[in-house]
């Protein structure tokens, strides 16, 4: 039997993070958490537009508390360093949490068999086209209207 880990909420001690719990998708017929990182100085200059970077497996990008096996990518820390060094334009970063048991279905473009974590034989349904529609037609318009 496959084991699926439920991801905890990110810690609330980071004012740069905005969590959208159970963001609903019509295309995927499910919900997932979305975390948005706002760069230093966000909102200080009226009308300023920021580039947006979207990350899959979004529970991993900022907080070890929510990251798979506690290994966060620390994307906010790295972006802040690069912004302060004037090496990048300050982006808004969006972490799209995976749904655990549905992860491979959503990322795979075609049905396929693969070995699960415990060696169990698994099969993906190949829902990448629907996942792309979720990103482009549902999530991006939400991010654009709320953060840009």
Question: Model-derived features: where do they sit?
Answer:
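Non-catalytic cap/lid and distal C-terminal segments of serine-dependent acyl enzymes
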Residues: 2-148
């Amino acid at each position: 039997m496959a084991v699926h880990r439920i991801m905890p909420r990110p810690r609330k001690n980071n004012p740069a993070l905005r969590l959208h719990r159970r963001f609903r998708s019509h295309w995927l017929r499910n919900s997932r958490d979305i975390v948005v990182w706002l760069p230093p100085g966000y909102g200080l200059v009226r009308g300023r537009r920021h580039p947006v970077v979207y990350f899959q497996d979004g529970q991993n990008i900022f907080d070890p508390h929510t990251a798979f096996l506690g290994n966060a990518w620390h994307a906010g820390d790295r972006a802040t360093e690069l912004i302060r060094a004037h090496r990048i334009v300050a982006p808004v970063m969006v972490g799209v949490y995976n749904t655990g048991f549905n992860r491979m279905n959503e990322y795979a473009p075609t049905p396929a068999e693969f070995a699960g974590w415990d060696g169990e034989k698994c099969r993906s349904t190949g829902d990448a086209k629907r996942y792309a529609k979720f990103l482009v037609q549902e999530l991006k318009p939400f991010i654009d209207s709320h953060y840009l």
